[in-house]
């Protein structure tokens, strides 16, 4: 059972989503609808993109806590360029490039300058957030072109063009990680850094690529965020980094690197967003969202740690079982007599 759960974290995440869908449905039958599924998916697109990027970084046994600030900074660039008269494709391309450059800078700090990832990205979290606020003077960006919001308008089956793009991108990244040498390098780097180097994997470049892709996903998340609400607050992206990491852990991405899938991270992001919708249904105040999300994350971390320890004990037991011969019938009988004599003495 333990091995099944460990090897099928995506299935357990999907089961959790189904349970969280059925439970509120018992309270309100209107919740059980395709419209609810598409509504939650629409709300989850930002977190899904960030979870895809976080997966790449976490697979290499690193972590990036600057993606929220990167998302905000990229959203500001998009808004500034659109208000300056640039076309939407040009503004989106520039936004994507900025995100990749920001991620590349994080990767250089970690892979080449050997700064621990948590320390480096904590620094860039403040740096990118500061650039964003200096850029806007602390003001909101409003008056964006109406064409931007069309990206989030439903086009097929209640899902927007940018929603379909997110699904296709998730499937593409899942295929790259599972079926190509490019993807296997991420797993190898996170699972055994020295071993990967001996096999010829350019581990520094793999880690820089992971952070760069993460920055690109943060830029896409900034575009989605802006298209959904039509303006850019000065706190855009705040707190998203923790939710992205939580989504990955919920979906089975190991904090120790080398294991997990993009599909699991996507399901984790959907589950976290689904919690928010259930809280709305239950009329629980919005300020409980972060508390409950944190509680769920802690619960999953504890469960993951206990599961890992149990599996390790089971593996050790199987490994050394062949060195421990079972007792002969004579030894078993002697042990039974000794136990009976001991019980008589005690009596």
UniProtKB/Swiss-Prot annotation:
One of its GO terms (cellular component) is plasma membrane. GO terms for molecular function: transmembrane transporter activity. The complex is composed of two ATP-binding proteins (LsrA), two transmembrane proteins (LsrC and LsrD) and a solute-binding protein (LsrB). Belongs to the binding-protein-dependent transport system permease family. AraH/RbsC subfamily. It comes from the Bacteria. It comes from Salmonella choleraesuis (strain SC-B67). Part of the ABC transporter complex LsrABCD involved in autoinducer 2 (AI-2) import. Probably responsible for the translocation of the substrate across the membrane. It holds the Pfam family BPD_transp_2. It is found in: Cell inner membrane. It is a multi-pass membrane protein. This is Autoinducer 2 import system permease protein LsrC. Keywords: Cell inner membrane, Cell membrane, Membrane, Transmembrane, Transmembrane helix, Transport. InterPro entries: ABC_transp_permease. The chain crosses the membrane at residues 14-34, 39-59, 72-92, 93-113, 115-135, 155-175, 213-233, 249-269, 284-304.
């Amino acid at each position: 059972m333990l091995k099944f759960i460990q090897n099928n974290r995506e299935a357990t995440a999907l089961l959790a989503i189904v349970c969280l869908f059925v439970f509120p449905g018992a309270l309100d039958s209107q919740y059980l609808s395709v419209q609810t599924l598409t509504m939650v998916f629409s709300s989850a697109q930002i977190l899904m993109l960030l979870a895809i990027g976080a997966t790449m970084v976490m697979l290499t046994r690193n972590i990036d806590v600057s993606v929220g600030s990167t998302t905000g900074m990229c959203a500001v660039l998009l808004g500034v360029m659109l208000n300056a008269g640039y076309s939407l494709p040009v503004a989106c391309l520039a936004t994507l490039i900025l995100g990749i450059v920001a991620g590349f800078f994080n990767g250089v700090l970690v892979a080449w300058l050997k700064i621990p990832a948590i320390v480096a990205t904590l620094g860039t979290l403040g740096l990118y957030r500061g650039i964003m606020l200096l850029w806007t003077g602390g003001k909101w960006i409003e008056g964006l072109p109406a064409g931007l919001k069309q990206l989030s308008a439903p086009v097929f089956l209640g899902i927007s063009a940018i929603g379909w793009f997110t699904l296709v991108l998730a499937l593409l990244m899942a295929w790259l990680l599972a079926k190509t040498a490019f993807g296997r390098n991420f797993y190898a780097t996170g699972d055994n850094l020295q071993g990967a180097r001996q096999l010829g994997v350019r581990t520094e470049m793999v880690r820089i690529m992971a952070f760069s892709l993460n920055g690109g996903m943060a830029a896409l998340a900034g575009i989605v965020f802006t298209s959904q609400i039509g303006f850019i607050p000065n706190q855009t992206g705040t707190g998203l980094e923790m939710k992205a990491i939580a989504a990955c852990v919920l979906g089975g991405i190991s904090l120790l690197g080398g294991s997990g899938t993009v599909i699991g991270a996507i399901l984790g992001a959907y589950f976290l967003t689904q919690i928010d919708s259930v809280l709305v249904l239950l009329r629980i105040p919005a300020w409980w969202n972060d508390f409950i999300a944190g509680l769920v994350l802690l619960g999953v971390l504890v469960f993951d740690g206990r599961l890992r320890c149990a599996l390790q004990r089971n593996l050790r037991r199987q490994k050394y079982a062949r060195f421990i011969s079972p007792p002969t019938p004579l030894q078993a009988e002697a042990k039974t007599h000794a136990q009976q004599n001991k019980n008589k003495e005690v009596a």
